[in-house]
Amino acid sequence: GYSSAASDVYKRQFINYPKEITFDNKISGALIITASHNPKQYNGLKMTLNKASLDEAQIKEVKELTLNQTNNKSSNYRFGLCRKFDIVSTYIEKISQSFTNIGKNIKIVVDSANATGGLVAPKLYRELGCEVVELYSEPDGNFPNHHPNPSDESTLDDIKKAVVQNNADFGIAFDGDSDRIGVIDSKGNYLTGDKLLLIYALDIVEDLVK
């Protein structure tokens, strides 16, 4: 793999996509094995270079390089190193420093759909001061509770009930690799992407007019 191409490899068993993108380290690129919100029988690759996703032309270039590679190596060829590492603590520390105590007096329900969100989100939100109710935080590629696609409102029945039953302020449901969310308000209503965009925009405008 990468190490045979003289690259040093840092290996993490489970990782969520935003965490990989924002990790502050001298890492040239990343390869994530993920099918995102697709059914469990599918898989795929997400590739980044210098913390940016590869565009179509770059992906084609990677394909050509892969198809045309050779195994001819000189006798003094250096294989790269392969190291395991855990960046969760570093990621949480970085985010919590940027958003100090924003979760104070806030109660949320987090539905990780037995995917990568459960490894980070509950701990991160608690670090930010939130009271957290967890749903399906244990990773399981069979997705035994529901499909990890928060864009499909039918997958949000459990979190809707949990938000109301726990008198939470809102709920957040993640997809398979945690780069998309579904949001439930305090009354158990699903907030569409358009409504979320409006909320974000109003917050930005409010900051601009201060």
Features from the language model and the residues they span:
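Single conserved hydrophobic/aromatic residue that forms the stacking wall/gate
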Residues: 1-13
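Active-site phosphate-binding/coordination module
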Residues: 11-72, 187
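Gly/Ser/Thr-rich loops at beta-strand to alpha-helix junctions
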Residues: 38-39, 114-118, 178-179
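Gly/Ser/Thr-enriched, mixed-charge loops and adjacent short helices
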Residues: 43-166
